[in-house]
Regions:
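Extreme N-terminal starter segment of soluble prokaryotic enzymes
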Residues: 1-4
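Conserved N-terminal subdomain of the carbohydrate kinase-like
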Residues: 11-23, 40-120, 134-139, 289-310
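Short catalytic helix/loop segments, enriched in acidic residues and glycine
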Residues: 19-34
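Short beta-strand scaffold segments in enzyme catalytic cores
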Residues: 34, 80-83, 208-212
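Conserved post-catalytic alpha-helical subdomain immediately downstream of the catalytic base
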Residues: 43, 224-294, 298-299, 304
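Short beta->alpha connector loops
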Residues: 49-51, 123-128, 147-151
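A short acidic, amphipathic alpha-helical/loop segment
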Residues: 56, 128-135, 156-160
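Conserved phosphate/ATP/ADP-binding segment of small-molecule kinases
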Residues: 137-141, 148-219, 227
Length: 310
């Protein structure tokens, strides 16, 4: 089955500790679509401007991404300018220019959502997320992401979007902004679940990800890397990978979520090893599976408890 990825393709300028990336293809949906397409046929809904390289859309199509839902504007593309701290832990957004995204129309996307088992609606204005959520087929498994800006400026709309979503992805700092209080983790997760999603995926950066909700708790550490050069898009790649894995398996249960989280974590590790989208452009599924097997072999399992007799 297919997955649906929406809505931002962009041109990025990113300052990193060891280099500066200028006018590179970016945007949350680029990372998410590349990740999703490793596991399932992927449909992309977005808009690009007159400066977006047509050859990149051709590349996405060759990777199994249906780009017919990508709209075109005569304005420049969505433009993100950012600078990372020396340790890559923090990023400062210097400029966000909507440009072509001001012309983005949601209703025309409806015909491209048919047959999509899952959908990842990446970080964007919650009012737009709501429109996309409402046009998706009712049985579609929906995943949304957000950021602290919308939690401050568009909280009522964001809460409505979270209530409609099956999976809500959020980082620790964002979660505290959302609930407007610093709480112990169990209380924080309880407050997030009251917003209505079936599952909360708690993004812990270099410490991995955790799942909470109606399917129980799952904790997946990060894959141990020798180096990371660019964290841009890692969370978007995670969301895209989860959508792709769920569509491939055609199931939404604890076991399929465990597979999706492990493979999503591995996809994120490939993402941060390259600049911009390089890591995702070059990786192939057998490499992902091999790294996942190595990763799982490093983790303790229930069998290890058999060594201790009660």
């Amino acid at each position: 089955m297919k997955s649906f990825i929406c809505p931002t393709l962009a041109i990025d300028d990113i300052t990193l500790p060891d280099t500066v990336l200028t006018k590179v293809v970016g945007g949350s949906s680029t990372y998410a679509a590349l990740a999703s397409s490793l596991f399932a046929p992927t449909v992309l809904g977005s808009i690009v401007g007159n400066d977006f390289p047509e050859k990149y859309l051709t590349f996405l199509a060759k990777r199994g991404v249906d780009t017919r839902g990508v709209q075109h504007s005569k304005k420049p593309s969505f433009h993100w300018v950012a600078k990372y701290s020396d340790d890559l832990h923090d990023v400062k957004t210097i400029k966000n220019e909507l440009n072509a995204f001001e012309d983005f129309r949601v209703p025309p996307l409806k015909k491209y959502t048919k047959g999509c088992y899952s959908a990842f609606i990446s970080n964007i204005d919650p009012d737009i997320q709501l429109k996309i959520l409402k046009l998706l087929p009712k049985k579609t498994i929906t995943i949304i992401d957000s950021m602290d800006l919308w939690m401050i400026e568009k909280l009522p709309a964001l809460k409505k979007a979270i209530k409609l979503a099956d999976i809500f992805m959020v980082s620790e700092p964002e979660a505290e902004v959302l609930v407007q209080e610093k709480l112990p983790l169990p209380s924080l997760i309880e407050r997030l679940m009251l917003l209505g999603p079936k599952v909360v995926i708690y993004k812990r950066g270099e410490h991995g990800i955790a799942m909470y909700g109606k399917m129980g708790t799952l904790i997946v550490p990060s894959y141990p890397l020798t180096f990371a050069v660019d964290p841009s898009g890692a969370g978007d790649a995670l969301g895209g990978a989860i959508a792709g894995v769920l569509s491939r398996l055609g199931r939404f249960d604890r076991q399929s979520m465990a597979s999706a989280m492990v493979l999503g974590s591995i996809i994120a590790s490939f993402t941060v090893e390259g600049y911009g989208t390089e890591g995702l452009e070059q990786v192939i599924l057998p490499e992902v599976i091999n790294r996942a097997k190595v990763f799982l072999s490093q983790l303790p399992c229930e069998d290890h408890l058999n060594l201790i007799k009660p």
